[in-house]
């Protein structure tokens, strides 16, 4: 953990109720709790607060780990790593699923948007002016090995609702080669548009933070380098983050 001192090392587990399978319509995900936490503002001392608490879930008929991950603001990587013996598509009814909804904040002093690449998780720090900071955290999907998301600093340079995807030449060549798709752009609102409904433009050329049309890809390396969030998470984050907000892509193991 890079020599970090951890505040609040006690592991807390909460048993959560099992909602009916019918609640996993798209509306259920947009109604889930927002993972936000108030902490003392980081001061660069090396202290890394823990936010959240581990939860336990009992599987019901029809559940998948993908649905549970999305419902509890986890990525595919997080829920599968926490439950290696459970079939992610057909978990046994009554099985105990560990929901790793507790996170060590990246070290040390950050402001704005921070994406920890190895963790596949975004943190948005909002200082409150009273010595505290509200931290919002969401799982993300990242670039594939051949399109790896780089480390670096940036600022939010723009925000777009229903963005058109102007397909870069390199990606278009891949689409032509793999599936004979010759489109040069996909308009906003089209179900084939991988940007989803919201997009943050960055000062880091060629990279963006946006939604997705494939929610199960959150917690996987499936993009061409951009950062993907669940549709409901980007919808919550979008109005909170103003243009000009600083950000970083970092590599810190946890």
Spans of features found by a protein language model:
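Bacterial N-terminal signal peptides
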Residues: 6-15
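Sec/Tat signal peptide C-region and signal peptidase I cleavage site
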Residues: 18-22
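Primarily a LysM-type cell-wall glycan-binding module
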Residues: 29-73
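N-terminal post-signal-peptidase region of extra-cytosolic proteins
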Residues: 54, 77-85, 96-111, 136-143, ...
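LysM (lysin motif) carbohydrate-binding repeats in extracellular/periplasmic proteins that recognize
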Residues: 60-90, 131-134
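Loop/turn positions that initiate beta-strands
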Residues: 62, 92-97, 244-247
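Gly/Pro-biased beta-strand-loop elements
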Residues: 106-213
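N-terminal targeting pre-sequences for secretion and organelle import
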Residues: 235-254
């Amino acid at each position: 953990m890079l020599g970090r001192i951890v505040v609040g090392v006690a592991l807390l587990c909460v048993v959560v109720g099992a909602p009916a399978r019918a609640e996993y319509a798209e509306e259920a995900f947009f109604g889930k709790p927002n993972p936000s936490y108030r902490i003392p503002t980081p001061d660069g001392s090396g202290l890394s607060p823990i936010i959240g608490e581990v939860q336990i879930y009992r599987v019901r008929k029809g559940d998948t780990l993908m649905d549970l991950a999305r419902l509890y603001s986890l990525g595919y990587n997080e829920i599968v790593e926490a439950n290696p013996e459970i079939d992610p598509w057909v978990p046994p009814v009554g099985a105990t699923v560990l929901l790793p909804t507790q996170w060590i904040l990246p070290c040390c002093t950050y402001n704005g948007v921070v994406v920890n690449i190895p963790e596949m998780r975004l943190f948005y720090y909002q200082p409150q002016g009273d010595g505290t900071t509200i931290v919002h955290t969401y799982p993300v999907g990242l670039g594939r090995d051949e399109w790896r998301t780089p480390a670096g600093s940036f600022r939010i340079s723009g925000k777009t609702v229903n963005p058109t995807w102007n397909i870069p030449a390199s990606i278009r060549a891949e689409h032509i080669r793999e599936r004979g798709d010759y489109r040069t752009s996909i308009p906003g609102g089209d179900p084939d548009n991988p940007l989803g409904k919201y997009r943050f433009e960055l000062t880091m050329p060629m990279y963006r933070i946006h939604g997705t049309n494939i929610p199960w890809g959150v917690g996987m390396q499936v993009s061409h380098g951009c950062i993907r969030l669940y549709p409901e998470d980007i919808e919550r984050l979008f109005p909170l983050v103003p243009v000009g907000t600083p950000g970083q892509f970092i590599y810190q193991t946890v």
